[in-house]
Amino acid sequence: VGLTLSGGGAKGLIYVGLLKMIDSLNIKVDYITGTSMGSIVGGLYAIGYKGNELDSLARNTNWSKYLTNNVPLNKITMEEKDEYGKYMIELNSNTLMPGLPIAVINGQNITSFLNDLTFRVHHISDFNKFPIPFKCVAVDIVTGKPVVIDKGSLALALRTSMSIPTAF
């Protein structure tokens, strides 16, 4: 049995219900592929998370914390509060030239979250060696063609698969 899980933002979390059903029926999954949110759900399942664990994770995670880079106002100095989040142009600290940020949201929060979730396999760089072999799909922003990722850091692969160029 092979599973291919597509993207679709939060709609991709519907696969959690499918995985819970697969677990309840004791169906053995032989391999998984996914893109975007489907890669996150599928990748976590491939490394050993069960459907009920993914359900709990989906329900109990403060997704807005991870999908934005908003800093709580109590962490910003009084002097900075008036200016916080006000400008769409950054000053490059190396060249001192103004420019646009690389992305509206740089994704550091979600990257850290994915690193935490995938820590159990941080030492495995070949995704075929996971409990369930896994591949995720991203898009090469230069060519616009799909790229299949099955080696390297799982957290980075998942983050790459869910990226939206210039936005996230």
Question: What positions do the PLM features span?
Answer:
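Patatin-like phospholipase
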Residues: 1-35, 43-168
